[in-house]
C-alpha cells in the first residue's frame, strides 16, 4: 500500500480516502450482496478439505500417523475457508472493512495462525515421510501416536501464541503511526508488519521451515534413487522383477509428488513472504491490489493441499466415491477395504 500521502492527523481523512478510493480497483467484482457462496476460491477449499476430513475420520483403514497429520492440516485449511475467507472476500470486493477494529484483530490473528499452522503441518508431513522412506525399519518406533500428538500440539499451539500475541499487542505495527491513521481514516484491516517483525516472520515462519522441507525432500529423493538402483540388480526371471517394476513406478511417483509439493509451496508462499520482508523497507509502497493478490495466493495453497495430499492417492479416490455415492451411510462402511491391491 502507498503510505506516502498518509495524513499526519485525522482532519485530512476525507481527502485521503478520496485519493485512495480513486486509485484502487477491487480484486473481485461481484454483483449483489452475496459474495460468499459463489466464488470457487471460497467453495473449493471447503469442499476439498471436508472430503479429506470425512474420509480419514470415517474409514478405519486410513487411520495412520501420516493421515492424522493430513487430517489436522485439512482441518486447518477448512477453518481458513469457513471462518476467514468470507470476510476476506468482502474486504476485497468492498475495499473496506465493516466489522470493527476488535473483530479485525481477531480475523487477522486467526488468519495468520491458520496459515502458519498449515506451513508447520507441511513441515511435519515432510518429517514423517523422511522416516518412512529413509528409515523404514524404525518408522513405527519413531512416528508413534505419542509423537504425532506432540507434533500436532506444536503445529497448533506455537502459531496460535505467536499470531494472537503479536497482533493483539500491536507489536507488529509498533512505531507505525501512519498505520493507525490508515485504520481510522479508511477502515483498513490487513496484516502489516514493521521492519523488525517482517524480518522475524520471514526467517522463522518461511525460511526455516522451507529450508527444512527442501533438505528433507532432497534426502528422500536421493534415498529413493538409491533404493531403485539396488532393486535394479534383482534378476528379471525372478519374482523380484515384478517388485522392481512397482518400485520404479513408485519412485517416479514419489519424485513427481515431491516436486509438486515443493513447487506449490514456493509458488504460493515465496512472493508473500518476500513482500512481508521487503515492503517495510520500501515505505509500504506496494499497491493494495498487489497485496490483495498475494493474500489470495496464500489462500490458494489451502486449495492445493487436499489435491496433493489426498485426491492424488488412490485410496482417497475410492473413499471419495463412497461419500458421493452415499455408500458411506451403509452399515460397516467404516471397515471398507480401500486397498484391494494389498490382498
From Swiss-Prot:
Main localisation: membrane
Q: Which UniProt keywords apply?
A: Cell membrane, Disulfide bond, G-protein coupled receptor, Glycoprotein, Membrane, Receptor, Transducer, Transmembrane, Transmembrane helix
Alphabetical list of InterPro entries matching this protein: GPCR_Rhodpsn, GPCR_Rhodpsn_7TM, TAAR, TAAR_fam
Residues with an annotated glycan are 145
Q: Which cysteines are joined by disulfide bonds?
A: 104-189
The record gives the membrane topology as: Multi-pass membrane protein
- Which processes are annotated in GO (biological process)? G protein-coupled receptor signaling pathway; sensory perception of chemical stimulus
Q: What are the boundaries of the region Extracellular Loop 2 (ECL2)? A: 173-186
The question of whether Metal-binding is a record keyword is answered with no
Pfam families, alphabetically?
Answer: 7tm_1
**What protein family does this chain belong to?**
Belongs to the G-protein coupled receptor 1 family.
Indicate what this protein is called per its UniProt record.
Answer: Putative trace amine-associated receptor 3
Instruction: Kindly list the organism's lineage.
Output: Eukaryota, Metazoa, Chordata, Craniata, Vertebrata
Amino acid at each position: 500500500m502507498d503510505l506516502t500521502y498518509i495524513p499526519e492527523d485525522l482532519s485530512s481523512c476525507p481527502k485521503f480516502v478520496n485519493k485512495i478510493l480513486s486509485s484502487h480497483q477491487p480484486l473481485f467484482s461481484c454483483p449483489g450482496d452475496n459474495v460468499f457462496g459463489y466464488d470457487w476460491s471460497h467453495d473449493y477449499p471447503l469442499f476439498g478439505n471436508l472430503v479429506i476430513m470425512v474420509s480419514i475420520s470415517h474409514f478405519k483403514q486410513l487411520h495412520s500417523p501420516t493421515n492424522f497429520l493430513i487430517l489436522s492440516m485439512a482441518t486447518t485449511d477448512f477453518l481458513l475457508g469457513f471462518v476467514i475467507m468470507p470476510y476476506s472476500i468482502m474486504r476485497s470486493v468492498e475495499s473496506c472493512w465493516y466489522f470493527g477494529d476488535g473483530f479485525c484483530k481477531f480475523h487477522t490473528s486467526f488468519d495468520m495462525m491458520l496459515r502458519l499452522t498449515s506451513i508447520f503441518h507441511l513441515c511435519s508431513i515432510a518429517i514423517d515421510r523422511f522416516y518412512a522412506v529413509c528409515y523404514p525399519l524404525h518408522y513405527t518406533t519413531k512416528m508413534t501416536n505419542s509423537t504425532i500428538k506432540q507434533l500436532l500440539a506444536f503445529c497448533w499451539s506455537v502459531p496460535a501464541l505467536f499470531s494472537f500475541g503479536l497482533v493483539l499487542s500491536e507489536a507488529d505495527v509498533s512505531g507505525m503511526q501512519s498505520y493507525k491513521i490508515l485504520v481510522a481514516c479508511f477502515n483498513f484491516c490487513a496484516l502489516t508488519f514493521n521492519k523488525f517483525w517482517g524480518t522475524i516472520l520471514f526467517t522463522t515462519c518461511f525460511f526455516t521451515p522451507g529450508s527444512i522441507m527442501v533438505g528433507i525432500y532432497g534426502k528422500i529423493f536421493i534415498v529413493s534413487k538409491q533404493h531403485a538402483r539396488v532393486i535394479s540388480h534383482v534378476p528379471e526371471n525372478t519374482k523380484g522383477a515384478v517388485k522392481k517394476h512397482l518400485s520404479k513406478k513408485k519412485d517416479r511417483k514419489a519424485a513427481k509428488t515431491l516436486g509438486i509439493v515443493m513447487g506449490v509451496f514456493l509458488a504460493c508462499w515465496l512472493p508473500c513472504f518476500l513482500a512481508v520482508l521487503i515492503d517495510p523497507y520500501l515505505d509500504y509502497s506496494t499497491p493494495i491490489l498487489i497485496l490483495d493478490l498475494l493474500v489470495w495466493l496464500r489462500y490458494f495453497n489451502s486449495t492445493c493441499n487436499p489435491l496433493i495430499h489426498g485426491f492424488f492417492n488412490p485410496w482417497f479416490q475410492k473413499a471419495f466415491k463412497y461419500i458421493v455415492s452415499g455408500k458411506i451411510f451403509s452399515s460397516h462402511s467404516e471397515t471398507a477395504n480401500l486397498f484391494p491391491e494389498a490382498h
